């Protein structure tokens, strides 16, 4: 017989396969049509969303559309342009162009015809009441707050003319016209800078509980409790003298034992530096003792060794400049061929001859396109092209300022035009001082401190926060009352070792600090009432810290053996490293929220550098051993960057865009460390997501921490618990940790996933994973209600879990990597293929079963006996089934037998008797009869079959075989 017909499922599978092949072919044809290399002509050229497409398919910036210039070269950009009508806030040029009103008479021609700077236009300008006129010849206006601020903002200096420096009654006027607080007069320090505050001073009289440094030599007065405390407080170190303290030698800080580890070198001046910096050619100790008695070494592979043994960069060898002190780097240098003499070296603009070869360069505003040809560039691609905002126009660009700032018409820098005068606050070890950056007033905020290093401010509440390393405490006070010890509030006084960095989140009312002794980063409310450790792993020497509450991130520096600068969310998630190369000792960091850049100083490399908030676009602004001998703190405001220097004992400032205009603000200081700017524009207002929630504190029982705003779907905040408690299943309440019988060290990272929960309105956390940051698990007593199930990883016993760091409600939990996402991806990668394979197997089985059924044939024939003896009109058929194995062979008939015929399966085959007579195979069983009752098939089965009571009789030797 022929092959069996395919079933519906088989046909369906074939159709699906054909459809898949058809789709693949269509996709290939579409790709070929779009790719000219495959024979297609390709689609029409598409322009960017901020571009206009000309009829000739050229793309131009959209701002060039209808600007009365044929930029498309087919005039299509000027077709169908409506007649311009300038807004009331714009200035209408004589040729019909519209520009901003503030651009009129600003010294730059924005109108194509120059009508915005014409004499006829500018003579009509009248300065508003809040502005100051620069005089009848300039026709310019500047904010009235810029009057007598020490900077000439008008061309002729009219804003500074007739300014007489008048100090307040409680201030001292220095010889250089600056004002100084009276307490700084005759204090032994040259605070004026010209020595006028220390002239004609008598020896100061010390109080009853004070110690005079230098004995009767007229030294400074210090509190008696500072004497013999193993820290030098007097410049002559007389407070730690051996005869006074009853121990040999000076204080412990001058002995090598003062260094924390054996990997540090003790300078003779008392400080400790990395042992690897000993004899490295760079003087790191104040007294340069780390480079004393060093053998003459060899230079690195990228350096050239001068005749006197010093090392300079190899690229400075034969550069026609004397870099070695003895000039040996230029000895024996030969001048090669000057390629620029022939056809300008092929350069379109500037050709520079080098020692080997030449180099093509471009003038300002151009860039190299093919190493030789210069083309115009978009100046606004440079983030430092403008002070704040850069707007690119055809052939030029325009700088603008953010609200609250105005542009200086001379320097083109944005200056604060709102609020009070900005002031600079810094620590001077035993004091916190303040300098008015406009009036140059110099005052003392907090006197008689022991060893203050870190500080920060909260402008809205006029509060100041600081850390004292000697007392190991964090304090706070109102700035106008901070000089009174009774008004100084202790916020944190427990579990502090070396708090060296401090930052205030002025939006969410939190303080963050680093502790190099505990190697932790922690957070607490501004009153110190609720506290939590965010990071306790992978920290070596954390120092400076800064926060960006507008975007929910914090940044910190680590000057350990593997120095780096890192960032994470303010709730401790999404930790990542920004800088790890070419960095040695990053002491201070600061943020410019407007330009979204991070600045830091490196005391080892003597550099001041910056990056954007993502770690890119790195720039080194200043590299100097003179101005950056040992920088520590750094701050930025407007277009200036400020930093303190321990070795120079001074405060410097420079232009934050190019590193130029370096100047000294204060000098003759005593160990100046941290530095901050106090001004309302430094801390812009923003909504507190935790307080905007319907529930107080965002519904969190303990801490409500802002989450990093990575995307529009990021949660606004997450809840956190104390170090010794768990976050409950609702992601808001806190519970005590399970009981632990012994202290267990958690060697590996533990990640825990919590099911989705509904948060406060507007915040839904779909999946929260967080990691155990702690390295030790304290022994705690379980205090969880019996009805509450504390979630934990099922494969880890309670003794291996640390509640101190497993109670965050957040999206990712691995503080070192996004392990939760990795595990989820791995699980999906395993499950999905298994499901696909299972579906394919099931489909194959169904197709096979359908084919099997269809391949089992039935033979139908009429029963004439039944038809003759009944009145049924239905056709009666007898079905004798067979299988493919049996074929068309019928069993033979037998006349007699002792036992029934058995079909014995063996390995899938049917065994027959050893002597199968043909008659034995012609047997069948009628329905309803026992299988032992066999009937012999007659010679004419269609006429001699017995009559049965069913319409159809079906025998299948495969399905209903003999027993």
Swiss-Prot record:
Sequence ranges of Polar residues compositional bias: 765-777, 800-812
A cellular-component GO term for this protein: caveola
PTM notes: O-glycosylated. Some alternatively spliced isoforms lack the O-linked sugar domain. Undergoes sequential, furin and gamma-secretase dependent, proteolytic processing, resulting in the extracellular release of the entire ligand-binding domain as a soluble polypeptide and in the intracellular domain (ICD) release into the cytoplasm. The gamma-secretase-dependent proteolytical processing occurs after the bulk of the extracellular domain has been shed, in a furin-dependent manner, in alternatively spliced isoforms carrying the furin cleavage site.
Gene from which this protein is expressed: LRP8
SUPFAM superfamilies: EGF/Laminin, LDL receptor-like module, YWTD domain
UniProt-recorded name of the protein: Low-density lipoprotein receptor-related protein 8
Membrane topology: Single-pass type I membrane protein
Span of the signal peptide: 1-32
Function noted in UniProt: Cell surface receptor for Reelin (RELN) and apolipoprotein E (apoE)-containing ligands. LRP8 participates in transmitting the extracellular Reelin signal to intracellular signaling processes, by binding to DAB1 on its cytoplasmic tail. Reelin acts via both the VLDL receptor (VLDLR) and LRP8 to regulate DAB1 tyrosine phosphorylation and microtubule function in neurons. LRP8 has higher affinity for Reelin than VLDLR. LRP8 is thus a key component of the Reelin pathway which governs neuronal layering of the forebrain during embryonic brain development.
């Amino acid at each position: 017989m022929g092959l069996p017909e395919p079933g519906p499922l088989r046909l369906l599978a074939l159709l699906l396969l054909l459809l898949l092949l058809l789709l693949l072919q269509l996709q290939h044809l579409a790709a070929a049509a779009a790719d000219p290399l495959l024979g297609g002509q390709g689609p029409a050229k598409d322009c960017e969303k901020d571009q206009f497409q000309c009829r000739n398919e050229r793309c131009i910036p959209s701002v060039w559309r209808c600007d009365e210039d044929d930029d498309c070269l087919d005039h299509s950009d000027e077709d169908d342009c409506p007649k311009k009508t300038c807004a009331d806030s714009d200035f209408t040029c004589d040729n019909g162009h519209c520009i901003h009103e503030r651009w009129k008479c600003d010294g730059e021609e924005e109108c194509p015809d120059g009508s915005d700077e014409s004499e006829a236009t500018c003579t009509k300008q009248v300065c508003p009441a809040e502005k100051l006129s620069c005089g009848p010849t300039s026709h310019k206006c500047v904010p009235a707050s810029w009057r007598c601020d020490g900077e000439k903002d008008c061309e002729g200096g009219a804003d500074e003319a007739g300014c007489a420096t008048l100090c307040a009654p409680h201030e001292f006027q220095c010889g250089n016209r600056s004002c100084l607080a009276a307490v700084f007069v005759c204090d032994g320090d040259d605070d004026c800078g010209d020595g006028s505050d220390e002239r004609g001073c008598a020896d100061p009289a010390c109080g009853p509980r004070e110690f005079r440094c230098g004995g009767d030599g007229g030294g400074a007065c210090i509190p008696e409790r500072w004497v013999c405390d193993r820290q030098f407080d007097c410049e002559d170190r007389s407070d730690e003298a051996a005869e006074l303290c009853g121990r040999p030698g000076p204080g412990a800080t001058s002995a090598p034992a003062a260094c924390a580890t054996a990997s540090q070198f003790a300078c003779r001046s008392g400080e400790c530096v990395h042992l690897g910096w000993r004899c490295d050619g760079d003087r790191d100790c104040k007294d340069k003792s780390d480079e004393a008695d060093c053998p003459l070494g060899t230079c690195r592979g990228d350096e050239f060794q001068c005749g006197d043994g010093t090392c300079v960069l190899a690229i400075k060898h034969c550069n026609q400049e004397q870099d070695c002190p003895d000039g040996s780097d230029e000895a024996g240098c030969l001048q090669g061929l000057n390629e620029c003499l022939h056809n300008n070296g092929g350069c379109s603009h500037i050709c520079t001859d080098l020692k080997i070869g030449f180099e093509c360069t471009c003038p300002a505003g151009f860039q190299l396109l093919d190493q030789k040809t210069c083309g115009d560039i978009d100046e606004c691609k440079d983030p430092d092209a403008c002070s704040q905002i850069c707007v690119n126009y055809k052939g030029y660009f325009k700088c603008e300022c953010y609200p609250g700032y105005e542009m200086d018409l001379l320097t083109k820098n944005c200056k604060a035009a709102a609020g009070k005068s900005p002031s600079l606050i810094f620590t001077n070890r035993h004091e916190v001082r303040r300098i008015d950056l406009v009036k140059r007033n110099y005052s003392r905020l907090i006197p008689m401190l022991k060893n203050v290093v870190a500080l920060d401010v909260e402008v809205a509440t006029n509060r100041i926060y600081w850390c004292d390393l000697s007392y190991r405490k964090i304090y706070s006070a109102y700035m106008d009352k901070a000089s009174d010890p009774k008004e100084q509030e202790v916020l944190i006084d427990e579990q502090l070792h070396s708090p060296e960095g401090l930052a205030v989140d002025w939006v969410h009312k939190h303080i963050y600090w680093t502790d190099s002794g505990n190697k932790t980063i922690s957070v607490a409310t501004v009153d110190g009432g609720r506290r939590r450790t965010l990071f306790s792993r992978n920290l070596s020497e954390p120092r400076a810290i800064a926060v960006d509450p507008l975007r929910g991130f914090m940044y910190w520096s680590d000057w350990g053996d593997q120095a780096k600068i890192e960032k994470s969310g303010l709730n401790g998630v999404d930790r990542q490293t920004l800088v790890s190369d070419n960095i040695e000792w990053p002491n201070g960091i600061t943020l410019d929220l407007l330009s979204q850049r991070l600045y830091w100083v490196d005391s080892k490399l003597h550099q001041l550098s910056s990056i954007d908030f993502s770690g890119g676009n790195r720039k080194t602004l200043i590299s100097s051993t003179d101005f950056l001998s040992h920088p520590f703190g750094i701050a930025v405001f407007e277009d200036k960057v400020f930093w303190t220097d321990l070795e120079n004992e001074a405060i410097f400032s420079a232009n934050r865009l190019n590193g130029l205009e370096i100047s000294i603000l204060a000098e003759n200081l005593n160990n100046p460390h941290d530095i901050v700017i106090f001004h309302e524009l430094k801390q812009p207002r923003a909504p507190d997501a935790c307080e905007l929630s319907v529930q107080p504190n965002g519904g969190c029982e303990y801490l409500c921490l802002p989450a990093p705003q990575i995307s529009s779907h990021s949660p606004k905040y997450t809840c956190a618990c104390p170090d010794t408690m768990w976050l409950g299943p609702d992601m808001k309440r806190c519970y005590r940790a399970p009981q632990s019988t012994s202290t267990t060290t958690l060697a590996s990272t533990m990640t825990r996933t919590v099911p989705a929960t509904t948060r406060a309105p507007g915040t839904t956390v779909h999946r929260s994973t967080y990691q155990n940051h702690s390295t030790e698990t304290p022994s705690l007593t379980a205090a969880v209600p019996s009805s509450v199930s504390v979630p934990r990883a099922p494969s880890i016993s309670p003794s291996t879990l640390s509640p101190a760091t497993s109670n965050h409600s957040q999206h990712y939990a691995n503080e070192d990597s996004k392990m939760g996402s990795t595990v989820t991806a791995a699980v999906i990668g395993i499950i999905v293929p298994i499901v696909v394979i299972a579906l394919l197997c099931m489909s194959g089985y169904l197709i096979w079963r359908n084919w099997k059924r269809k391949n089992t044939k039935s033979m139908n024939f009429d029963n004439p006996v039944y038809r003759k003896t009944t009145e049924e009109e239905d056709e009666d058929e007898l079905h004798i089934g067979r299988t493919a194995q049996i074929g068309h062979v019928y069993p033979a008939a037998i006349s007699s037998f002792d036992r029934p015929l058995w079909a014995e399966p063996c390995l899938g085959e049917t065994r027959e008797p050893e002597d199968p007579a043909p008659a034995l195979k012609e047997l069948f069983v009628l329905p309803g009869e026992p299988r032992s009752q066999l009937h012999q098939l007659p010679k004419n089965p269609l006429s001699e079959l017995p009559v049965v009571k069913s319409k159809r009789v079906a025998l299948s030797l495969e399905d209903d075989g003999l027993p």
